[in-house]
Amino acid sequence: MPKYRSATTTHGRNMAGARALWRATGMTDADFGKPIIAVVNSFTQFVPGHVHLRDLGRLVAAQIEATGGVAKEFNTIAVDDGIAMGHGGMLYSLPSRELIADSVEYMVNAHCADAMVCISNCDKITPGMMMAALRLNIPVIFVSGGPMEAGKTKLSDRLIKLDLVDAMIQGANPQVSDAQSEQIERAACPTCGSCSGMFTANSMNCLTEALGLALPGNGSLLATHADRRALFEEAGQRIVALTRRYYEQDDVSVLPRSIACKAAFENAMTLDIAMGGSTNTVLHLLAAAQEGEIDFTLADIDRLSRQVPHLCKVAPSTPDYHMEDVHRAGGVMGILGELDRAGLLNRGVANVLGLGLSETLARYDIMRSDDDALQRLYRAGPAGLRTVEPFAQSCRWDALDRDRQQGCIRAREHAYSQDGGLAVLSGNLAQDGCIVKTAGVDPDSLVFRGPARVFESQEEAVEAILGGRIHPGDVLVIRYEGPKGGPGMQEMLYPTAYLKSMGLGKQCALITDGRFSGGTSGLSIGHVSPEAASGGAIALVRDGDPIEIDIPVRHIRLAIAESELALRRQQELARGTQAWTPRDRRRKVSLALRAYASLATSADRGAVRDRAKLGG
């Protein structure tokens, strides 16, 4: 029988000092026999996805204490990728994931907490906490802050839905008036919550639900809706029960490594492919799997990507649907239900509810259950009012979207495409693989060939795009932006957004060892591995080199002779200590970022630390 971790600090005469300090936090004698549960919050006023979380930690804590536990709150950092975008701040985004994971480990192990409720929401916070949860392997439930309502405004007497990416594209489009650009900017992000499309934050929150670590509705129920309160309350109550099952009944099935097993990771990735999620999810799932010592690799993702259809199309891949529409169509459980009917899921998995997949879908898939409470839950919709308050409204759609032929979520036989929304490509330009979000690629661009235009920084590429120096048919190659080479693996949302604003979104390709925002669409190929700084062939590309992309056959190729490629490699190695570094880039890199770069692996390994360098 496992012993409560917290007993290390609450029992025994030699822990008198620790108990004295616990008493100073408000604990009493009666509390020293209860489980101590960490409420891991991520409130900050810097990030709209987290600005409303301040009081939600106390909401969870109150339920923990009412159910017989002791709640102790702490906060992690949270970087807003949108605000950090387009300047040196983006270098810090991905490295913050490792800091978040480490900080959770530090706090939970230093104070011997028994379990956790993780309150996350945005891009690197959910994966950072997930990495920590699988590293620590103590009972955990995730509950996110929820998605933002889609922006809405009238243009030419037509009501349109908007999100952050629309504001960026319009702002850079010289054909758009200042007045229209400002109108869209003001309407694009109307409420608190994670940005309203299937960007990285919402993708990851959907995946925690698919992994079984979050409650049904977590990925899609709006941040502003009153119904979301119940998720926080139930998380607080249920974590106490899970904690007691593990420590008092030796039930290891409640632990995160038991729930988020390889079969669950495959289900989560299957969901991701079916809904055309952010390519960043590939990085984060690979990283989390390594923390949990789960044998889940890019090869598994490649295998799944070849058999899973595209069942749910959401912004930025279409302007028609946002997360509020996904929720109306049944949310994550609705997509999983269609995947299950298609025979594409592993059914032998469980979740924090203690239910298997079949029983979960029987209860929570709107196509299988006519339960009034369930129907009411998934009719929760937007109010269209600007607010930063959670639970601020209780509007409901008149009816659910159960149209599986032409609705937001579709059955396999009516899929948007029989090829899924993500694909792994490989070839001499990316020997260890690269990722493309096929959900956002125009069908006419699935096979593409063009001359390379090489840039050694995102900033240099943006200058060329806005300066009119990029032409239809060009293949932009942005290198030395990988985990080590950046360092920090910047997102390339600005280059892709500016290509659209210049009318080149469907006429050019972009290849990088960096990554892309979940808001990216178009022929954008990222995570090229090995990265340039690790000796990858992307470092050897020269202006004018022909590059061939064939998504249907999963191939990417630098179309030059192998002898020429070998010669260029020898020439690069001849640079000595300057080999595999940018030739002409001025970028200030802090000591903190250099420390990250010294241990970073390429994207095919999740951009995690190289354990071999740490002796394990």
UniProtKB/Swiss-Prot annotation:
One of its GO terms (molecular function) is 2 iron, 2 sulfur cluster binding. Mg(2+) binds at residues 81, 123-124, 491. This is Dihydroxy-acid dehydratase. It holds the Pfam family ILVD_EDD_N. It comes from Edwardsiella ictaluri (strain 93-146). Its EC number is 4.2.1.9. The lineage of its organism: Bacteria, Pseudomonadati, Pseudomonadota, Gammaproteobacteria, Enterobacterales. Belongs to the IlvD/Edd family. It catalyses: (2R)-2,3-dihydroxy-3-methylbutanoate = 3-methyl-2-oxobutanoate + H2O; (2R,3R)-2,3-dihydroxy-3-methylpentanoate = (S)-3-methyl-2-oxopentanoate + H2O. The gene is ilvD. Homodimer. It comes from the Bacteria.
